[in-house]
Amino acid sequence: MSEKTFLVEIGTEELPPKALRSLAESFAANFTAELDNAGLAHGNVEWFAAPRRLALKVANLAESQPDREVEKRGPAIAQAFDAEGKPSKAAEGWARGCGITVDQAERLKTDKGEWLLYRAHVKGESTEALVPNMVATSLAKLPIPKLMRWGASDVHFVRPVHTVTLLLGDKVIPATILGIQSDRVIRGHRFMGEPEFTIDNADQYPQILLERGKVIADYEARKAKIKADAEEAARKIGGNADLSESLLEEVASLVEWPVVLTAKFEEKFLSVPAEALVYTMKGDQKYFPVYDNAGKLLPNFIFVANIESKDPTQIISGNEKVVRPRLADAEFFFNTDRKKRLEDHLPRLQTVLFQQQLGTLRDKTDRIQALAGWIAGQIGADVNHATRAGLLSKCDLMTNMVFEFTDTQGVMGMHYARHDGEAEDVAVALNEQYQPRFAGDDLPSNPVACALAIADKMDTLAGIFGIGQHPKGDKDPFALRRAALGVLRIIVEKNLALDLQTLTEEAVRLYGDKLTNANVVDDVIDFMLGRFRAWYQDEGYTVDTIQAVLARRPTRPADFDARMKAVSHFRTLEEASALAAANKRVSNILAKATEPLNDIVHASVLKEAAEIELARHLVVLRDKLQPYFADGRYQEALIELAALRAPVDEFFENVMVNAEEKDIRINRLTLLSKLRELFLQVADISLLQ
């Protein structure tokens, strides 16, 4: 069977830059699935993406499906014919579905009986006939949140479409996709190269587009070129470019022919906090800031043009003129804001609503102040500094700088607090109160900052759950999942002695009578324990390990973590599976017991050697392990408990638990309950698979 290279390119208006990669990857994944489902043999499926095009190139695509033999078994002969030998309705319906009559069917004899059988040789369809619908289906499945319609057409897509190129080798596959008739025409760069040209063979792509159209269609190659050229440009001025992955991706999605240039701004603007300048350069203008080797911002920036100009100085000058007013605004806001102390903004917080039922930002500030102080007392942080940080925590939201450059909240609070002469850990806390902002983000660096960050997040959790607006499905407008995980990460990774029970109760208490959900404390704790499940699954822990610990509902996060590590280690022991099975058996036996058990195991009632030996082991371990449990040394405790495997096995092999004599039966059930209680001090081992 012959094979050829296949090419599809969809030429569009400028595609959304932040979605470009996902669109291209989804297109490739969807089309690959279509090929596989159709049974079309193929080689590598390569995707290309630039601002005005999505393309796929498939190597070694078979020109048709392979022929195949089809067999369809019908009803058994006994059900296929009536007593007179006439075909039944079931047989006739099956035959119609196969496109034959009953008398044309073959018969299949097996050891289990005889059935009607249809056999056929089906010729594979040509790739040319199959591909148009496969491309259309792949495009229809793209993750596009909002579709566009253009002109008088009813066609919808992410952006208007101008060209559709469909080539199998050197042949155009005729089709109408997204309202456009397929052709071999490709459009080049808007301002360079040939605006439009034809491609003779799919193998010429993307090289022909590079040479004639001045477009680097290979997304990764374009991104790598930007990165390398920007690094070289920064090196030439003695600096290091801030090439964050997200901005690199966005810039690579904005240009088809990247030309990296270096510009500068006035040094006087360096008196403004670097974060505000960087926000302007990266967020608004998509520029790459440049730092010296000490990490200090330089008065330069690197940007990427989408054209190779004969006079790049004009482009540089134009970008410098664009950014200057924004930097001047930042300078003005910074100087204006410093004329007031942070504390002077407190009254204005009363004018901003946090949530209609929960009050204003000033109300939230008062709660955070009290809760941060309480947390500081629990974890050994400076209580006065924590309450001060809580009082000032939202004041920077009222400043000109944060109003204009919203992403600078927190960091500007830190700078203004330093200007006001606040304690350094207070100033740092104002910046770090929102950490961690995302998975893998840094945690607050000092105890005061930890207290403030936890207080802010717990106040939100308690309040929103307290009015019954917990997350539903994918909707989480108050980012409660992120807040809960942030609290857990801080407590666990900083090893803080905080209990979710008392922490949540204190956060709820500070709301007074504003909350309407009587179960708010339990709801918040259950929600946070649920975030533990997601966290530990991401860390690679098995679901049953997590369930075993969750069954005990430990509310101290650091304690939860210790139990997780202990159970995970226990699973590696040779005795683990047998003891897990024994615990499951014990759990089932106790669940069926209807008689009240004794408080203690009565030694005088023990008869069999195996139960006497098990009881002896339990007494020894109970006394030995109490300090382990008290200190959270769960891993050591489970290692000791592993020694119970032999006496437990002996017990179940030689002792009848449900003895006829009531005293003996209840004593043995009590013995098993004491065994289970020891393991439950750590986790419910019976849930391990």
Swiss-Prot record:
- Give GO cellular component annotations, separated by semicolons: cytosol
Keyword set, alphabetical order: Aminoacyl-tRNA synthetase, ATP-binding, Cytoplasm, Ligase, Nucleotide-binding, Protein biosynthesis
List locations, semicolon-separated. Answer: Cytoplasm
Recorded hits in InterPro entries, A to Z, give:
DALR_anticod-bd, Gly-tRNA-synth_bsu, Gly-tRNA-synth_heterodimer
Q: Which GO terms describe its biological process?
A: arginyl-tRNA aminoacylation; glycyl-tRNA aminoacylation
Q: Which reaction does it catalyse?
A: tRNA(Gly) + glycine + ATP = glycyl-tRNA(Gly) + AMP + diphosphate
Give a GO molecular function annotation for the protein. Answer: ATP binding
* EC number, UniProt record: 6.1.1.14
Recorded superkingdom:
Bacteria
Q: Main site of residence?
A: cytoplasm
Question: What is the enzyme's class at the highest EC level?
Answer: ligase
Note the subunit structure: Tetramer of two alpha and two beta subunits.
Similarity comment text for this entry:
Belongs to the class-II aminoacyl-tRNA synthetase family.
Name this polypeptide is given: Glycine--tRNA ligase beta subunit
The organism named in the record is Salmonella dublin (strain CT_02021853)
Q: Which gene encodes it?
A: glyS
